[in-house]
Amino acid sequence: MSGQENHDHGRISSTPAAASEPSKAAAHSSDYAPYPKLDPTDVTPPPPQPIPTGAAATTMPAESNPYVSPSPAPRNTMDSVKDTLGKWGKMAADATKKAEDLAGNFWQHLKTGPSVADAAVSRIAQGTKILAEGGYEKVFKQTFDCLPDEKLLKTYACYLSTSAGPVLGVMYLSTHKLAFSSDNPLSYKEGEQTLWSYYKVVLPANQLKAVNPSTSRVNTSDKYIQVISIDNHEFWFMGFVTYESAVKSLQEAVQSHGP
């Protein structure tokens, strides 16, 4: 499928994270799927609950959602991530002690995942990647199929709620779409093999129906944004560093492009 045609229908084809991909069997059974089949409960998930320690996703959630598009990653990617976590673990631990003195959403963003240190390291790694590759605009266009005149408007570090747990990544808002990509690849099974894939969501701007901010009744510092497509698929985002700005930008996108 071409990039432009896919954007019109809310679907994009996955783009490999590396030149090489795992070899696939020559023949498959009739119920074969390249990644776990969708769980109907994940199409319209309930409002997120407070996330217990250790709940962040490391495996690919089962999705039937037309806006979800996994993107294969090399098998050794997670090994590199683990090596980085090991090398930077002590530095991250020291940094998070100082982070306790910081107010507002950034600390809440770090606490959304199972490990403050891991979240901090992921943010550092993501920032390094952005700098190395020439900024968010270039990373956005490398990660997603974009139209020639498409411009990136905003980016937000956040988590996406899934049936497998919250997924840490970056939300991208452009002139043509709302998109999300995980910072790290998630694992999934293909036969006996464990493979890795980045978790991506793409909603064309003209498919946005509503954006609803909400706050947890249990802990008012837990804030969420519910995004609904015109065909009633729901996505719950949380752990924003700049929550108010994200709400404002998303609601403006609905007003500009929505039905």
Curated annotation (Swiss-Prot):
<dbReference type="Pfam" id="PF02893">
    <property type="entry name" value="GRAM"/>
</dbReference>
<comment type="subunit">
    <text>Interacts with AFH1.</text>
</comment>
<protein>
    <recommendedName>
        <fullName>GEM-like protein 1</fullName>
    </recommendedName>
</protein>
<comment type="similarity">
    <text>Belongs to the GEM family.</text>
</comment>
<dbReference type="InterPro" id="IPR037848">
    <property type="entry name" value="GEM-like"/>
</dbReference>
<dbReference type="InterPro" id="IPR004182">
    <property type="entry name" value="GRAM"/>
</dbReference>
<feature type="region of interest" description="Disordered">
    <location>
        <begin position="1"/>
        <end position="79"/>
    </location>
</feature>
<dbReference type="GO" id="GO:0005634">
    <property type="term" value="C:nucleus"/>
</dbReference>
<dbReference type="InterPro" id="IPR011993">
    <property type="entry name" value="PH-like_dom_sf"/>
</dbReference>
<feature type="compositionally biased region" description="Basic and acidic residues">
    <location>
        <begin position="1"/>
        <end position="11"/>
    </location>
</feature>
<feature type="compositionally biased region" description="Low complexity">
    <location>
        <begin position="13"/>
        <end position="30"/>
    </location>
</feature>
<feature type="domain" description="GRAM">
    <location>
        <begin position="138"/>
        <end position="215"/>
    </location>
</feature>
